[in-house]
Amino acid sequence: MRLYNTLNRKKEEFVPLNGNKVNLYACGITAYDLCHIGHARSSVVFDILVRYLRFKGYDVTFVRNFTDIDDKIINRANETGVTSTELAEKFIGEFYVDMDKLNILRADIEPKCTEHIPEMIELTQTLIEKDHAYATPSGDVYFKVRSFDDYGKLSGRNIEDLQSGARIQPGEEKQDPLDFALWKAAKPGEPSWESPWGQGRPGWHLECSAMSEKYFELPFDIHGGGQDLSFPHHENEIAQSEAATGKEMARFWVHNGFVQINSEKMSKSLGNFFTIRDILDKFMPETLRYFLLTMHYRSPLDFSFEALEEAEKGIRRVYSALEQTAEALNKSKWSKAALPEEVLAEIEDAEKGWADAMEDDMNTAGAMGHMFTLIRLAGRIGEEKSWRKSEGGRDAWIRILEDMKKWGEVLGIFTRDPKEFLEELKLCMLERKGIEVAKVEELVAARQEARKNKDFARSDEIRDELIELGVEVKDTPQGAVWSVI
């Protein structure tokens, strides 16, 4: 498998550092608010990376932290009249609700910053002893950026460029504007812990260095997060961990791209900010997950409700095909005929294509293209009378369903019972249109009655009325079947 390594700015062959074992650390949320679709994207990306590595047979240990002490948490807690701990616990709980809906597997280890204060103090002391950090008279501790020669190697920034925009704020006791806080002296009303430098709390960058070093020996295989974390957060993590240990921190640095709204970065100030809950009020969770896979994980992803509706059509098409294929396999008699070799070759090409796409920097969009190839092929087999009644057609359908199930488990989609999913989707789409199911079923029944009475003019009127509502009716031997357009 080739993965893009931000550290070296190129795709590289991924080979675990320790045999079959893969250690992966991803930065988690700062628990002060509901998760937005940017969090959903990052979580889905690393969920699929873990799933795919396990699918390949690797023994993966996945660590994803929770930042449960931070300026944002303290400020929000003060605004709402709760403690920082209460606020963080509330939003960690809400995080799990959202992630479970999106079919995101729990990480193996989910450390919280406040449970690792001794490790953070120890790391800070080591950096001071090695002259990479210094304590100020007021009890802050800063990392000496210029003491670490490789600073900037992840983000490609150099000290001179950083220096030009750096300023020491009034009241700060930095020796250099570039230095960043490892430990912050306590302020009135803030949570704090005892340390050699007095009461205080850890800086954000220190937290991830200390927690990743606790659970993994350096270097570990993969460190991940959103593109916005590469600088300064991940750059500072590298500086801290490598200055303290003299070892490389992580072999691969993997970053997912931004979610954009109309080609602009999502932000509350621009009024284009959507939480996961905002989306799931209108769409099924699997539709959102599917949408997040339609673009390569490193590319910007342009979000819109229109794009989600297109994703909804795609996912409905797949589940409908899975349902039809499963029903077609319920035949009891099959002719001995085989399928043409070129049809079998199409299946093999799709199987190879899916594997090649995933091996090439986890190209989920390309992989899903090959899944649609199989779905189209399943439909073609059903349309060709001699194929759909043959053992060759039956075996091809079985193989296609097995491939879709196997690949769906890796991508976390297409794994539900199709009939159940499509029924839920129908109700979800109706609710979004503001139409009650009872109203639709009443009209469908009235149309059936008109047809029974050979009142075709009335039947057509009702059909047109349903189409106006966005509902299509098909007449089948089993009766009228309606769907949302």
Swiss-Prot record:
Highest taxon listed in the record's lineage: Bacteria
Cellular localization per UniProt: Cytoplasm
Cofactor names: Zn(2+)
Binding site for ATP: 268
Main location: cytoplasm
Gene Ontology BP annotations: cysteinyl-tRNA aminoacylation
Keyword Metal-binding annotated: yes
The family this protein is said to belong to: Belongs to the class-I aminoacyl-tRNA synthetase family.
Name this polypeptide is given: Cysteine--tRNA ligase
Organism: Maridesulfovibrio salexigens (strain ATCC 14822 / DSM 2638 / NCIMB 8403 / VKM B-1763)
